């Protein structure tokens, strides 16, 4: 089950968009419910710049503790913890390939997790991405 609300507004030299999303899964065996939430906002400004932020929260089950192992006989999936991710990013459009829209960018994500998940996520989990974005020119999607 999912639900979402989005908003998109043109600006003089850019665009602002926002989405709020919720999703729910139910474990078939136990009927246990797991929820996930996401809020994201992107601002295109000065014609060639994009900045965004995203907040995510997701319920994780005991299956996470198995790693790559298969579920042992009689294993019952149980709620384990809620994990959060906080992301901020930036990219700048520049002409590189004719007919394509290209940008260089970066984003950083910090994670919130309970101590029980430190062996899986580490003490202070952080992710950093540097990227080259390439897409067909004329795409109305602003990020």
Per-region residue spans from a language model:
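Residues that define the transmembrane beta-barrel architecture of outer-membrane proteins
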Residues: 1, 14, 33-37, 82-86, ...
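Outer-membrane beta-barrel architecture
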Residues: 2-6, 38-42, 89-91, 129-133
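Short loop/turn motifs that connect adjacent beta-strands in outer-membrane beta-barrel proteins
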Residues: 7-16, 48, 95-104, 137-143
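Transmembrane beta-strands of outer-membrane beta-barrel pores
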Residues: 9, 22-28, 55-61, 92-94, ...
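Transmembrane beta-strands of outer-membrane beta-barrel proteins
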Residues: 14-20, 39, 49-53, 86, ...
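Extracytoplasmic loops and strand-loop junctions of Gram-negative outer membrane beta-barrel proteins
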Residues: 21-23, 69-76, 114
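Outer-membrane beta-barrel translocator domains and adjoining extracellular loop/strand segments
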Residues: 29-36, 63-70, 115-123
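Outer-membrane beta-barrel "beta-signal"
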Residues: 88, 122-143
